[in-house]
Curated annotation (Swiss-Prot):
It comes from the Bacteria. GO terms for biological process: translation. It holds the Pfam family Ribosomal_S10. Part of the 30S ribosomal subunit. This is Small ribosomal subunit protein uS10. The keyword Ribonucleoprotein applies. It comes from Mycobacterium tuberculosis (strain ATCC 25618 / H37Rv). Belongs to the universal ribosomal protein uS10 family. The gene is rpsJ. InterPro entries: Ribosomal_uS10 (IPR001848), Ribosomal_uS10_CS (IPR018268), Ribosomal_uS10_dom (IPR027486), Ribosomal_uS10_dom_sf (IPR036838). NCBIfam families: PRK00596.1, rpsJ_bact. Keywords: Ribonucleoprotein, Ribosomal protein.
Length: 101
């Protein structure tokens, strides 16, 4: 796999879970002998939802809820077969979405 690159994008609502997962991936890649770039923090996506507090009237009384989606990018340069095998066996939390390209 010489000259190739694996790009891993991580998404999660919890920044501690995504940082721990990124740290675990980087440690695994370095241990297997490939070089790694990252984790690069990408812009956090913030969704704000406005909800009327009252079920009937009082439209001026509203409540705001937000969801933040944290994202990280990790590039693995010149991965070895050992690196790919170790990445397939790594155990990450269910709250972290992993996209491998």
């Amino acid at each position: 796999m010489a000259g190739q690159k694996i790009r891993i994008r991580l998404k999660a609502y919890d920044h501690e879970a995504i940082d721990a997962s990124a740290r675990k991936i980087v440690e695994t890649v370095v241990r297997t002998g490939a070089s790694v770039v990252g984790p690069v923090p990408l812009p956090t996506e913030k969704n704000v939802y406005c909800v009327i507090r009252s079920p009937h009237k009082y439209k001026d009384s509203r409540e705001h809820f937000e969801m933040r989606t944290h994202k990280r990018l990790i590039d693995i340069i010149d991965p070895t077969p050992k690196t790919v095998d170790a990445l397939m066996r790594i155990d990450l939390p269910a709250s972290v979405d992993v996209n491998i390209q």
